[in-house]
Amino acid sequence: MKFFGVPALMLAGACSTNSGSLAPSPQSHVAAPRAVSHDRRWGPNVSAACPDRRPDEAQCFLLIRTGPQLVPDGGSGPNGGFTPAQLQKAYNLPSATRGSGQIIAIVDAYDNPRLADDLAYYRSYFGMPAANFTKYNQLGQLGAYPVGNEQWGAEEDLDVQMASASCQNCSIVLIEANSPSAKDLGNAVKAAAALGAHIISNSYGCYTACGLKEKYFEARGVTYLAASGDDGYGTGVGTPGAFAAVVDVGGTTLVAGVKGKRGFEESAWPGTNSGCSHKSKPSWQHDPGCAFRTANDIAAIADPNTGPAFYDTYGFSGWLVGGGTSASTPLIAGAFGLAGNASSQNGGRTFWEKAHEGPNDLYRITRGKNGTCKPAYLCQEGTQEYRDYGGPAGWGTPNGIGAF
C-alpha cells in the first residue's frame, strides 16, 4: 500500500485490542487528496499530512518523513524515529512515576476508527502499560463519531501517542470534531473542558481569519496548548496559538548521540512558526519588538527529519516518522500532566513569568532560526536581544517538570 507517497512499511506485529469505537461504514470514509511537500524548510523527503485548508477551516500540522533518514543521529526506534524512552531522557521527564489521575484531552477533526488499536500497539511495542483511553464525539458523547479521514486520522495517532510518550500514566481522551470548521472545533474544545480535562492539546490552526473564537479557550482551570504551525517565520502567528490563554508551542530539531550529560542537543527547527501576532499584547509580555502577542512560549521536538516514531494503520501500513509542531504540542501537554498543576496555570503566561525563576528547569536553545527578521529575536535563537528568549523555541524546552 502507498499513501501520500509513503512506501508500505513492514509491521512489527498485530493489534488485538478492541478499539471500543463505532467504525464508520465504507460510505462514510474520506480519503482526502495526496499531499506534497511545499516548503523547503522541511527538507526534501517530507510531506504534509493534511491538504491546504479551505478559508473557513483549520489545518492539521502533522508532517511525515517520506524518504530515508538523512540525519544520522536521529532516534533508535522504527525507521529511525525517536522512542518514548529517548524522548523522556531528552527532556528529563519522570514519566514512569507521575501523571496518574491527570486527563489530557486531544482535539482533532474527523474519525480514526483504528486509533485505539494503534495506540495499544504503540504502547505495547515500547513496553508501556495499557492506556486509559476514551474517544468522544464533539458533543462529549460516546458513539456517533464523525466520518473517517485518513489525514486527520494520522494526526490523531501522532497526538495520542506523543501524549503517551511523555505521560504514560495520564488518562487520554480524544474529542473528534465533525469537521475542521471553527464552529465544530470550538464545540469539541468546549466538550473537552466539560469532560473534566485540565489539559487540552490542539495540533491544528489557521493563519487567516477562519473564525476560531477565543471564548472557547478561556475556561477556568484549563491549560490549553496549540501548535504554532510549520511554515516558518513570515506566514504569521495563527490561532488558537495566538490567544492569550493558550500555550503556543514551537519546534526544535533534536539530535541524539551527543557527548555530555544530556546526550542530546537541540536547535531551532526552521519550519516552526513564530513572531508577532495580530492579537492584543498580554500584560505579562514585555519584550520590546512586538506590540502584539509574541509567539512562541515553549517548544519541543518537531523536525520530521529527526522526529518521533509513531504507528498508523488507518491510512498507512504501520510505523512512520512524524513531526511538525503537531509532535511538540501533545508532548508538552504530557509534561503538564506529569507536573499535575495544569488547573492552576494560566496559558503562556506561565513561562513568561517563571522563565527567570528556575533557569535550570528549561533547556535554553541558543542556535538556529526560522527566517530573517527585525528584531532578530522573533525568528532566531541566541540573540540576547530579549534575555534568553527566541521566537522559534520560546523560553526553551523541558528539563524536567519544574517549569510546569
Regions found by a protein language model. Name each.
Residues 1-8:
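Sec-dependent signal peptide recognition
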Residues 5, 221, 316, 326, ...:
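A residue-level detector for conformationally permissive "hinge/kink" positions
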Residues 8, 43, 53-54, 365-366, ...:
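Residue-level signal for mature regions of secreted extracellular proteins and peptides
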Residues 13-14:
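C-terminal motif of bacterial Sec signal peptides marking the signal peptidase cleavage site
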Residues 18-21, 333, 340-391, 399:
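An often Trp-containing, charged/polar helix-loop segment at the C-terminal end
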Residues 25-251, 274-324, 329, 340-349, ...:
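Substrate-binding/charge-relay-adjacent region of secreted/lumenal peptidase catalytic domains
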Residues 148-153, 189-190, 261-267, 380, ...:
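Short, surface-exposed amphipathic charged segments that create phosphate/polyanion-binding patches used
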Residues 248-276:
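Polar, glycine-rich mid-to-C-terminal structural blocks
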